[in-house]
Amino acid sequence: DVNLQGTINLCAALEKVGAPRAFIFISTVAVYGCDYGVNITEEYPLNGTTPYAMSKRLAEEYLQNWCRKYNVVLGIIRPSLIAGPNPPGNLGAMITGICRGRYFSIADGRPRKSVLMVQDIANLIPLLVRKGGIYNVCDSYQPTFRDLETLICKQMNKSLPLSIPYWLAKGMALIGDCLGCLLYTSPS
């Protein structure tokens, strides 16, 4: 797991060359485990249960202990959906899915998503180097998924994706999760 094991490996390497003054970790709002969220503060319980959310939460916990031990200023940023050139994560997967014709809109794309530009995150990092702390970061711009789909389709010269009902998407996800558990074999 890159988030936790990569963090542990990086800290071990830093111990050999000397701990830095500050460490900035880009986490995720997924650590809260909410399908939706309004006014979620940094004190909100960390209930994320997906492997991604859990790995980020465990990496945060590891860093909090490590930074305390080595007297390092720790800044943790928990961003929403990150946008920019070659976006990572869910937005990148959405773009790829639309381009390949393997993306379905859910519930007519009505849900909204806070979108944060990667440059905005970059602008925060120098501030956190001095101050540290944990910060949820989002933008006031909260387009619907249909807005995002329309923009992507227009830029990629693709047709808007077919929309499926929420209950069907949830059922398909559950079946996929079950199959994943049945078919997954641990690396030896």
Each model region followed by its residue ranges:
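Conserved small/polar residues in nucleotide/adenosyl-binding loops
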Residues: Y184-S188
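Conserved Rossmann-fold NAD(P)-dependent oxidoreductase catalytic core, especially the SDR/UDP-sugar
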Residues: I8-P51
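Active-site Tyr-X1-5-Lys
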Residues: T49-L74
